[in-house]
Amino acid sequence: MKKFLPLMMAMVFALMSCAPKNPAQVSALLDRIGGEGTSERIETQVKTALSEDGKDVFEISSKDGKPFIQGSSLSALTTGIGWYLNHYAHVNLSWNNLTTDLSGVEFPVPEVTERRECSADYRYYLNYCTYSYSMAFRTQERWEQQIDWMALHGINLPLAAVGMDVVCKNVLP
């Protein structure tokens, strides 16, 4: 039992460190779309306890005079960021323009907490035609912007048809 207690304590501390405030990838996303320093002006946190039934949930509130966005997963959190930018800050980020200078934008601080729950487990994106008429011509930078756009819109199931031909060959008669 004496050997078991330190092991348990180490596991508890390891698990506590797995719920980061301002996750690095979310901070990087904010700085990519809004310019350097945007991540310091919006507080974010992944909080799995927000979801009671496994659905993606985000909440928008305020903390220390800043917007505070929490999500039950990284996908929910980035969706919440997209919702906040669109519906609170009135910033429209589109496919063709996913970056803007937000240094001069004063982010509104919500007075009440807004909670949104996604009704769909899977948010599908793309179609088979996209592989031929647009994806083939994208650069690495354009791919990164597309992934950021998907994150801001809650996409968690982009079409990945690469290798599908092998599955069809092995499964279909």
Q: Residue spans of the language-model regions?
A:
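Bacterial Sec-dependent signal peptides at the C-terminal "C-region" and cleavage site
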Residues: 13-24
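Feature activates predominantly on carbohydrate-active enzymes
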Residues: 25, 29, 49-51, 63-173
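Sec-dependent signal peptide recognition
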Residues: 2-10
